[in-house]
Each structure stands twice: as C-alpha cells, then as structure tokens.
C-alpha cells in the first residue's frame, strides 16, 4: 500500500530540481538500451534530497502506460514501481498525495491507473464527480457514467 505523502518535498521548497522525462525513468527501470541506461543511472543516482528529480503527473501517467503496454509489466509490478517512486526522498512527484490516492484505488480495483488519477484529480479540485463514457471507469474508478 503506498504512503500518504506528507513530509515529501514540493516544488515550492526552493530546491534545485531537475525534471525527468518519462523515457529517462523508463531506461532507469528497464535497462533496455545500454547507452541511455548508463546516462539515466548517472543522472538519477546523482539526485539527492537537496537536488531532487521532479516527476510531473503527465510523466507518472505516461510511465504507467509505457510499462504496461510496451514492457508488459503486471499490475503488481506497476504498483511496486509507483510505491517506490512515491517513497523516494530523491524525487518530488507533482501532487504526490493525489498520485498516492490514485495508486491505492488502482491497486484495489479493476480500473486503469489513468482513470484513477483523473478521478482523484477531480476530487482534489473539489469536483462533485467526474463523468465518463467509459463503463469500466464508472464502475471501477468511481466516475459517473454519462449516457
């Protein structure tokens, strides 16, 4: 079960951060291209609490999609990867609390991670609900089916 980030650094803390694109994180996790993997390891291993890497919500969503579709990661592996990223002191994840909530929903349901993230983002924005034409998102991610 992922943490409920509280003391996680945020972009507003005045840290010297670098943004990480999805492909850098993918290379770091999969080691499928020797040269790019070496470069990704060099950058990510140099991160610290004072100079963390930043993962945007888009990178997190794209990472899940790439790992599922291109690398055939199982749901349990996706949950483990995201849980590890959320717990890392060397990473700042945009809206980490929403990512953690979406991960909990994803882990416990049949919903896609992106649907869980969309629904949790709507809740965080104080939406009454999120409408969708996707039957699975409505039944599994807590959205309202639009007919």
What is each model feature region?
Residues 50-53, 90, 126-129:
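Short active-site oxyanion
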Residues 24, 59, 98, 117-118, ...:
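Alpha-helix capping/helix-boundary segments
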Residues 1-55, 70-76, 147:
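Short, well-structured N-terminal submotif of metal-dependent ribonuclease cores
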Residues 20, 54-55, 93, 113, ...:
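Short beta-strand scaffold positions
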Residues 1-17, 119-147:
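Acidic, PIN/NYN-like endoribonuclease modules and their adjacent C-terminal/linker elements
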Residues 27-29, 66, 140-141:
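Residues that scaffold the ATP/ADP-binding catalytic core of kinase and kinase-like folds
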Residues 32, 57-58, 80-108:
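Acidic catalytic patch
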